Regions:
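Extreme N-terminal starter segment of soluble prokaryotic enzymes
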Residues: 1-5
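Conserved N-terminal ligand/cofactor-binding loop architecture of enzyme catalytic domains
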Residues: 21-114
Length: 152
């Protein structure tokens, strides 16, 4: 049976090159969460360099203006040992000095909740053996890393 590798793809294409090389040299099934804006999305939808078993486009799973489920977020903090507000305060998008948009507390929690639900669904569906990602550079990426680590 092939190893299952979940790959986090963002704007840094070096991870994409590593995934391609990994697939060429090892028997593994690659899955990916693609965290990019809509403009470059078409490339990842149509590319044939890396054959992913399944891919999730992160932004397709995030909707604005949803009321956060506080009980679910407490469950995430407890089961995965994640301090949600600590991560949110350090996120470059939610950061209080972001001049482009000021997120409300509900917006922040809603986005984090939707992210966690996506990540839980992905991890439950594929049960990966390995995680391939660069150093975390966003709150959502760090939450995914922590959830993978907690699941073992």
């Amino acid at each position: 049976m092939n190893s299952k590798v979940i790959h986090w793809q963002d704007f840094d294409l070096s991870a994409f090159g590593i995934a391609k090389n990994l697939q060429e040299k090892h028997n593994c099934d690659l899955f990916t969460i693609i965290d990019i804006p809509n403009r470059p999305k078409k490339f990842f939808q149509e590319q044939s360099f890396v054959k992913y078993q399944k891919k999730w486009f992160y932004h397709d799973h995030i909707s604005p203006n949803k009321k956060p489920d506080i009980e679910y977020l407490k469950y995430i903090e407890k089961n995965y040992k994640i301090d949600i507000w600590k991560i949110a305060y350090n996120d470059r998008i939610f950061f209080k000095y972001n001049d482009f948009y000021k997120f409300t507390s509900d917006e922040v929690l809603s986005i984090i909740e939707q992210s966690c639900k996506l990540f839980e669904n992905v991890l439950d569906e594929i049960n990966p053996d390995f995680l391939l990602m660069p150093v975390t550079n966003s709150g959502r990426m760090h939450i995914f890393y922590e959830m993978c680590k907690a699941k073992g």
